[in-house]
Amino acid sequence: MAEDGPQKQQLDMPLVLDQDLTKQMRLRVESLKQRGEKKQDGEKLLRPAESVYRLDFIQQQKLQFDHWNVVLDKPGKVTITGTSQNWTPDLTNLMTRQLLDPAAIFWRKEDSDAMDWNEADALEFGERLSDLAKIRKVMYFLITFGEGVEPANLKASVVFNQL
């Protein structure tokens, strides 16, 4: 039996709900409503079904995207959108131009335990994360929850091969 070479070590890096940042962005929306003000041109306001997540790169160099590991514990849908924002929301508002394309969309149907996803876009997005890891220690994401799921129903991580 021939071997394909040495097994690559993998790193499974979780996407973690950033409760403080999510709260800060929700306060921005409330503040604008209370004062009767409008958002800045191009500003992205957090919608009720969106939360901010972060990925702390425990290693920045020599990472190759392998796969997303996304599980919903009930039927529903999540859209994971990366941001180019290095966040200081008390100083800088998130702008729509800082949202990265493509987004990765994952869903679980009512009659299935299996997860489905938009494979090509999710793969392209994941491969971009390998490049972003070289210049970032932290990456932020907007996750949009749909069809009855919320943060408590999601477990998500990105798996990289160490080169």
UniProtKB/Swiss-Prot annotation:
Gene3D superfamilies: Olfactory marker. Its main location: cytoplasm. One of its GO terms (cellular component) is sperm midpiece. One of its GO terms (molecular function) is peptide binding. GO terms for biological process: neurogenesis; sensory perception of smell; signal transduction. It is found in: Cytoplasm. Interacts with BEX1 and BEX2. Belongs to the olfactory marker protein family. This is Olfactory marker protein.
